Amino acid sequence: MQTKQDGRLGTEKIGKLMLELALPSVLAQIVNVLYNIVDRIYIGRIPDVGSLALTGVGVTFPIITIISSFAGFASGGGAPLAAIALGQKNRERAERILGSSTSLLLFFSVLLMAFFFVFQTPLLYLFGASDNTIGYASTYISIYLVGTVFVELAVGLNTFISCQGHARTAMCSVLIGAVVNIGLDPVFIFVLHMGVSGAALATVLSQALSAAWVLRFLTSKKSGIRLSPRTMKPDFAILGSVMALGISPFIMSATESAITIVMNHGLQTYGGDLYVGSMTILQSVLQLIFVPVNGFTNGVQPIISYNFGAGQFDRVRQTIRRMIAITFTAAFVYVVFAMLRPALFAGLFTTDPKLIAIVVKVLPVYIAGMAIFGLQSGVQSSFLGLGQAKISLFIALLRKVILLIPLALILPHFFGVMGVYYAEPIADVCSVVTAVTLFLCNIRKILSKEALAKVTHTEA
């Protein structure tokens, strides 16, 4: 049975669909990144200890990123495959993909929470904590870990709502958590004097509400594919396909942790706590654009997957062209503005003149390559939407594992602390050129009945 909601993905005008599906996703991600940014702004302004508290929370990002990465492991593979199945009018398979992915998320939740509770202290030191910042880092992450299952379900299952074309519902799940977090942060941090503990508690409560919203929808009659105990029995053939496709977004996200570890270690070795703090600000500046860009590509991806599954390749081409043009333009304009106004962004997060001076110096260097990175964002999302696991995996590995991490380890030996910052733009430019080349060389072959048959055969 085909619902009106998912059927329109193959019939309505592409421009209208992109606006209707991507706009809610973008708005949701903007609010989502704002609550993360506001979190850091509040922490950075805690009286007397703001800079150290901000640095301490910053070194927990690898753990937080890894937790979110495992959610993307299930959803990044499961949602595109579910959308392709919907395009083929195979709702039963789409529901089995949803159920198996949910079981995988629950398994990840237990595993991750147990692991990080046991090893958090040595890991935090490895990630760049010092004796001055370990207390703030440990306090924050201990509370955050309690809500691991909420993060996995809220992040991991929301894409199964958007892949059906329910963009506004998916947006609401993010907005609920974001608004609650923004509202609770100042109350817990300043009014109740809970400091870093308050920031973590606000995050856990907000994620719990988001998870409840997502589960309520996916188990209701409003959802085109419904989650039920019957479909949650793991289907290992499906899980194999989900993980094969999901490994690319997983590596893209999880390797951010490895990058943060390597960079924080280099910054701590060659600079000190303030340089580690600068990386927290730099990553926040990039999030302000690339989280919304990812929201846009996530919103558009169901159009690509559905029409690919339906064999409507002309609609796929039109969607991809428009998506890449928009992601490139948005990223280019924002990055150039940030390069010209580094003090404006630094001042959002700290009043410490020494930290501001560092950010003003390094921000234009660090984000320079991101001016063209919108091209890769569009290309990467296209490959994922088309079920191209191997190419997506290679692109993810190239930028972060093959290029960025080795450069961040090698360049500081020649350029000191600035070598850590130089690594990013070099890796970005090389990666974008490679991704675009692969796209141009492979897209015609991918948009064929033969390629579609291979994708659906491995999943069946």
Write out the residue ranges for each language-model feature:
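Hydrophobic transmembrane alpha-helices of multi-pass small-molecule transporters
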Residues: 66, 181-185, 211-215, 287-291, ...
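Small-residue-rich hydrophobic transmembrane alpha-helices
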Residues: 54-114, 151-170, 278-342, 373-392
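Residue-level signal for transmembrane alpha-helical positions in Major Facilitator Superfamily
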Residues: 19, 34-35, 74, 115-119, ...
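Short alpha-helical transmembrane segments in multi-pass integral membrane proteins
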Residues: 1-22, 82-149, 191-247, 304-369, ...
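Short runs within selected transmembrane alpha-helices of multi-pass transporters and secretion channels
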Residues: 75, 144-162, 170-178, 199-212, ...
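Transmembrane helical elements of multi-pass membrane transporters/channels
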Residues: 20-39, 143, 177, 206-210, ...
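Helix-terminus/linker motif at the lipid-water interface of multi-pass membrane proteins
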Residues: 30, 34-55, 124-131, 187-194, ...
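Residue-level signal for short hydrophobic patches within transmembrane helices
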Residues: 15-34, 38, 63-70, 146, ...
